[in-house]
């Protein structure tokens, strides 16, 4: 394109004008194409610029070609008339030039025009296009909420052919859990069912209902081949607790009538989250805490609850030497909520996630670095004031004894003699808040040296008097002076014989 030779412009201005296609007119006149000039052979003469435009509206396209006089070029270096424009309902594209018939060109259109619906879509189709994505988003959100709400209810499916390691022939039809446990204890290593059998059992359990929640996750009642089981489902962040508890439960020779019967452990990754399952025997009475809240007990019932708890703890604490031996184990979180009541009125100790084992050969204790664990209300004085000897395994056993003395106090309060009994309460209910801190417990137990109150009426009943004596000997500030679990078991066994109680 040419630019007016006589225009007093710098080289920079020439470059800008050329780049923007906004041109000053030639000094002499020239001819342009004019679509309205029918008498002059569609030609006009101007001393300004040739002009061409195309205007698009919602329903038509208008082409326009003509001459623009120099006097109409305002401002002269960037005329408004040569600038493209856009307003509601139309878009105009323009082009100005300064050579003969330079505007005789076809400008491109921008179509389809903005705001105009595609010619192929009617009102119904347009509504479908708009409503479709909206419905999809709504359904997706509802599905996500449903999955999140019911994720723990997802049933384990029967193993399929894509997972041959879980094929059903490993457990024949008609086999019961009792059969499997019997075979394991009589012919196996005594350390639990084979992992393949555990996984097969876990993945064929149908969950029925949630029966409890805790800091680890949730407990469900489930069914395996018609038999009721308890399923403890750990949250994924509690994987260490799940692994530790499964490991402790599978300790050689641990199985005992007063230790919760372990059945299986399994982890299942469904692609979105990991479920960590611990399957055990189901006891419909629930925890000792729940049981004592609901019922009072007779003297016989009190002795059965206490003796079975002591028997379970004595078995945990005891080391069995031999080829199929068992290491000594300390519970470290003994309380009424971690003891279950069986159908026959006896107890079994559960929740071994914080337990520690002692290797007598090397005199080592497998314990996490943080020793301040368990429930603050049941912590022994030496745990509260940090004076416990972490390198001495007996220290952990003695702390368990202190906690068991508090559990006995909870049981004895609910023993009804002549229709008289105390309401259920947690230990130190009258001395500390419902969720006491370590400092609050330390002040009461270590500084003030207070212990739960023993009612005077207990002295009028031999069984309650013996229970009170055992409690006091479990609560000594000096752990070495406390009774052992085996000594307590023997004392309660003698009491049960005196009372004519059959366990």
UniProtKB/Swiss-Prot annotation:
Record has Signal as a keyword: yes
Family (UniProt): Belongs to the protein kinase superfamily. TKL Ser/Thr protein kinase family. TGFB receptor subfamily.
Broad class of the protein's primary localization: membrane
Any one GO cellular component localisation term in the record: bicellular tight junction
Binding site for ATP: 211-219, 232
Endpoints of the signal sequence: 1-29
Domain GS stretches: 175-204
Protein kinase domain sequence ranges: 205-495
Record field: catalytic activity: L-threonyl-[receptor-protein] + ATP = O-phospho-L-threonyl-[receptor-protein] + ADP + H(+); L-seryl-[receptor-protein] + ATP = O-phospho-L-seryl-[receptor-protein] + ADP + H(+)
Cofactor: Mg(2+); Mn(2+)
Name under which the protein is recorded: TGF-beta receptor type-1
């Amino acid at each position: 394109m040419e630019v007016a030779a006589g225009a007093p412009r710098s080289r920079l201005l020439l470059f800008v004008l050329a780049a923007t296609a906004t041109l000053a007119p030639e000094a002499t006149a020239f001819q342009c194409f004019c679509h309205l000039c029918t008498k002059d052979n569609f030609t006009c003469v101007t001393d300004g610029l040739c002009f061409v435009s195309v205007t698009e509206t919602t329903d038509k396209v208008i082409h326009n070609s003509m001459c623009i006089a120099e006097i109409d070029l305002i401002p002269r270096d960037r005329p408004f008339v040569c600038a493209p424009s856009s307003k509601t309902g139309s878009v105009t594209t323009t082009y100005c030039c300064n050579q003969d018939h330079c505007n005789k060109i076809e400008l491109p259109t921008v179509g389809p025009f903005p705001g105009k619906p595609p010619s192929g879509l009617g009102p119904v189709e347009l509504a479908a296009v708009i409503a479709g994505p909206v419905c999809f988003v709504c359904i997706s959100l509802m599905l996500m909420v449903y999955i999140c709400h019911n994720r723990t209810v997802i049933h384990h499916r029967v193993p399929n052919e894509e997972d041959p390691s879980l094929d059903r022939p490993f457990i024949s039809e008609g086999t019961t859990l009792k059969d499997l446990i019997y075979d394991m204890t009589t012919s196996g290593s005594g350390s639990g069912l084979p992992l393949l059998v555990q996984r097969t059992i876990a993945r064929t359990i149908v969950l029925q209902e949630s029966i409890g929640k805790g800091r680890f996750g949730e407990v469900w009642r489930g069914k395996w081949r018609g038999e009721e089981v308890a399923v403890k489902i750990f949250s994924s962040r509690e994987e260490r607790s799940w692994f530790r508890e499964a490991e402790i439960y599978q300790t050689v020779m641990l199985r005992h009538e007063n230790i919760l019967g372990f059945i299986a452990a399994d982890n299942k990754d469904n692609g979105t989250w990991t479920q960590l399952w611990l399957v055990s025997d189901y006891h419909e009475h629930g925890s000792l805490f729940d049981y004592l809240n609901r019922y009072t007990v007779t003297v016989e019932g009190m002795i059965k609850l206490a003796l079975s708890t002591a028997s379970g703890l004595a078995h945990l604490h005891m080391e069995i030497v031999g080829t199929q031996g068992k290491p000594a184990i300390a519970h470290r979180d003994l309380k009424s909520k971690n003891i279950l009541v069986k159908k026959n009125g006896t107890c079994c100790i559960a929740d071994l996630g914080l337990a520690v084992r002692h290797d007598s050969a090397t005199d080592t204790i497998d314990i996490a670095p943080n020793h301040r664990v368990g429930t603050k209300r049941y912590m022994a004085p030496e745990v509260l004031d940090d004076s416990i000897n972490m390198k001495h395994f007996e220290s952990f056993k003695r702390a368990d004894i202190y906690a068991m003395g508090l559990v006995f106090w909870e049981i004895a309060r609910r023993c009804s003699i002549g229709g008289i009994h105390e309401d259920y309460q947690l230990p130190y209910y009258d001395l500390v808040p419902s969720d006491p801190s370590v400092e609050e417990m330390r002040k009461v137990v270590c500084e003030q040296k207070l212990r739960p109150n023993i009612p005077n009426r207990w002295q009028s009943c031999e069984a309650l008097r013996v229970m009170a004596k055992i409690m006091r000997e479990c609560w000594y500030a000096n752990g070495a002076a406390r009774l052992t679990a085996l000594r307590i078991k023997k004392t309660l066994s003698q009491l049960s014989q005196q009372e004519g109680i059959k366990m």
